[in-house]
Amino acid sequence: MPYAFCPAFMKMKELLLQPRLQLLADMVPAGSRLADVGTDHGYVPVWLMQRGRIAAAIASDIGAEPLRHAKETAAEYKVSGIDFRLCAGLDAIEPEEVENILIAGMGGETIQTILSDAPWTADGGYLLLLQPMTKVELLRKWLSDNQYHFTEERLVCDKNHLYPVFAVRGGAGTPITLVQQYGGVMLDGDPLYAAYLEERIAKLYKVMAGLKKSLDPENAVKVKNLMDICRLLEEKRGTL
């Protein structure tokens, strides 16, 4: 049966996402209830709700100004059904309100703090979509050590930057190697993996160059450890 023509739909202004946010939106399970923590302009929940991809959304932010922008985005694209909350992390979100949690666009240490402050996220009933901007290796290690297991990891290139996105669940930690901690847990087969490894290696060499300028004798040990990690990443890159 052909679809009926709907003039109202044709006039609807559609939100378009940049590649990083598009990947995050694509990884959200259909029909679920989502909490977007640190929502900023609210682009991901608005995009998902506009297309009927999710049942409900909570958009939270620690800042009043970003939350105001998120409300304006929803109004601009005529999207309802999003609950906007001013709070730090998951402080104002109850476990029974959501099935999926998106935390993106912030440092890995901040994401770690948010999850540490909400231990209920580790019980296995929630899919966490995480996109750290910094300290990626620290977040991978913390997740592994704190009973979260990786179900998916993907890379996306946005404005000449490579970003990793993890999908994790609580319940049983995934033991990871140094190569996985620094280079990715589930990226074998990703077309961007070789470029990502090269980027990670270059950043480690930059850190080592800075450490070598210091007279602190402890830095010599740090440099040796980082050099060992670089060798492992280079070996991995050579297998791709």
PLM segments and residue spans:
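Conserved class I S-adenosyl-L-methionine
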Residues: 31-40
